[in-house]
Amino acid sequence: MDPVIIGIGGPVGAGKTQLVERLTRAMSEEISMAAITNDIYTIEDAKILSRTSVLPEERIVGIETGGCPHTAIREDTSMNEAAIEQLKARFPDLQVIFVESGGDNLSATFSPELVDFSIYIIDVAQGEKIPRKAGQGMIKSDLFIVNKTDLAPYVGADLSVMESDSKVFRKDRPFAFTNLKTDEGLDVVMDWIRNDVLMADLG
């Protein structure tokens, strides 16, 4: 059975790499995983994952996309597709491959030909009105995450406002609030992977 491909998108600094690091660490005993990172001119995120993640270095592939990072996850996904095939051949037991996009704007989305499910992550420091802007990444993702909840008091963000706005544009689609620095809310994301992603794939 092919692994499930989960895309992770969001602006620069929102916590995409940290989310992959935390998920792979927390779920390493139950799921066989690998990760692909997309950066414009470097493979810095892949290097960070190699240092901080429990994933062996050979299970992490860094891609230098050049130009606009959203092109590699939507218009021309060939580099990511090649990396996925490389990981599948190298590790036949893989159950989940995370594809982290380069930092991009609120409208960036993954091609449905590339990923099976997508996560879009923002952080509280971008302001409580961000969910109200309802960019395509936030609307169309299978899971929406508001990260760095611990910063709310320092940036004047009201989490209850962000939650109510998220409910409006997400409708029946799930969303979560996290502080990945302490793993607060990570259990919600892991349950989503277990119940919505892996169980759906079995179905």
UniProtKB/Swiss-Prot annotation:
Coiled coil: none annotated. One of its GO terms (biological process) is urea catabolic process. CDD domains: UreG. One of its GO terms (molecular function) is nickel cation binding. Keywords: Chaperone, Cytoplasm, GTP-binding, Nickel insertion, Nucleotide-binding. InterPro entries: CobW/HypB/UreG_nucleotide-bd, P-loop_NTPase, UreG. It comes from the Bacteria. One of its GO terms (cellular component) is cytoplasm. GTP binds at residues 10-17. The keyword Cell cycle does not apply. It is found in: Cytoplasm. Gene3D superfamilies: P-loop containing nucleotide triphosphate hydrolases (3.40.50.300). Facilitates the functional incorporation of the urease nickel metallocenter. This process requires GTP hydrolysis, probably effectuated by UreG. Homodimer. UreD, UreF and UreG form a complex that acts as a GTP-hydrolysis-dependent molecular chaperone, activating the urease apoprotein by helping to assemble the nickel containing metallocenter of UreC. The UreE protein probably delivers the nickel. NCBIfam families: ureG. Belongs to the SIMIBI class G3E GTPase family. UreG subfamily. This is Urease accessory protein UreG. It comes from Micrococcus luteus (strain ATCC 4698 / DSM 20030 / JCM 1464 / CCM 169 / CCUG 5858 / IAM 1056 / NBRC 3333 / NCIMB 9278 / NCTC 2665 / VKM Ac-2230).
